Amino acid sequence: MDGTDVTMLMREIGVRARAAAAELAFAEPSRKEEALNAAAEAMLARSDEILEANGRDLAFGAEKGLTPAMMDRLKLDAARIDGIVEGLRAVAGQPDPVGQVIAEWDRPSGLHIRRVRTPLGVVGVIYESRPNVTADAGALCLKSGNAVILRGGSESFHSSGAIHAALQDGLRQAGLPVDAIQRVPTRDRAAVAEMLRMVEHIDVIVPRGGKGLVGLVQAEARVPVFAHLEGICHVYADGDADLEKARRVVLNAKTRRTGICGSAECLLIDRAFLAKHGPVLIEDLLKAGVEVRAEGELAQVPGTVPAQPEDFGREFLDMIIAAKVVDGVDEAIAHIRRYGSSHTESILTENDATAERFFRRLDSAILMRNASTQFADGGEFGMGAEIGIATGKMHARGPVGAEQLTSFKYLVTGDGTIRA
């Protein structure tokens, strides 16, 4: 496909998306719910087709030499399809954000003012190897009254296509425009460049992928962007941490799934914790098969690898973690401010004052206490699913669910009211 063809294709998709968004903005909540539940049923009915398509993508990924972490992101099985189905149903059951009254008040002039949620319009989602993003993004945009243009990575091309077909089955059954959820039907990377320039047709871009993709989008987009560059998540074991809680959380935060943005990439151990309990957290990680890149006295623990300066502030997305000792919560905070990506940080402590200091003095999108960073997920936050984790400070922040995909407008009612 040459450049002219891609430009024309993307313009056509954009025009259709804008028309669908205009209709979707006032669709009844019951019809959107029906479409999502029908899409969930279609996903189950098409599960063999989806798995066959995923097999083709996995073969393609193996040929390209994808890392184990990327292959894990790409892989679908019956359990993961069930998870997608549950996510669709959960989004269907969420309150519809469109039209919700955020605030209302009366003015001395006699005006009654309401601020109500309204769709953004058209959302463009650019993602890499996770085919489940097709379902999550499609569902959340539909729930929030937005049309969406999906551009999945070349690795997940067939899987995303099969999932997209199920989403459109749901739209048809509910009598909603199938153009409300469109997928870019080409692997040509020129389509991404076109999306980033489509200011007339797309209201916001959400990139979902690695640092290279997100950095490219942020650098070149003319359309506003919701994004995070990396998930450099920290776990800090305070001197007042409960040992057994700390052991459970650290292992889970690193090893449950290493290829997700909520995986812990750096462990900070308070010197007081080390004095009480020794290097037990490091030993647990080593026994679990994690490569621990340790600094200072932690590098003396047998089996660790000496940390290099570049290991701090690095997203490994693998069975690797950086580790160092800190003198108190303030040094932990300083380290996170320097090396973190404003994604998710967790403090392990039984001391309320220390936890409050950690929460008040850090400004990451998600801050946790005595909980695994792997909970940094819209589904775990009760959103049903997420379109991504936003770490910026404008508009959406943290897990981006249906509510975060809305703006607002003011509805002002008078009674022949005029301004003096």
UniProtKB/Swiss-Prot annotation:
Species in which this protein is naturally found: Cereibacter sphaeroides (strain ATCC 17029 / ATH 2.4.9)
InterPro entries, A to Z: Ald_DH/histidinol_DH, Ald_DH_C, Ald_DH_N, Aldehyde_DH_dom, G-glutamylP_reductase_CS, Glu-5-SA_DH, GPR_dom
EC number, as in UniProt: 1.2.1.41
Record flagged with keyword Amino-acid biosynthesis: yes
Transmembrane segments: none
Protein name from the UniProt record: Gamma-glutamyl phosphate reductase
One Pfam family linked to the record: Aldedh
Function: Catalyzes the NADPH-dependent reduction of L-glutamate 5-phosphate into L-glutamate 5-semialdehyde and phosphate. The product spontaneously undergoes cyclization to form 1-pyrroline-5-carboxylate.
Matches recorded under Gene3D superfamilies: Aldehyde Dehydrogenase, Chain A, domain 1, Aldehyde Dehydrogenase, Chain A, domain 2
Biological process terms in GO annotation: L-proline biosynthetic process
Catalytic reaction(s) noted: L-glutamate 5-semialdehyde + phosphate + NADP(+) = L-glutamyl 5-phosphate + NADPH + H(+)
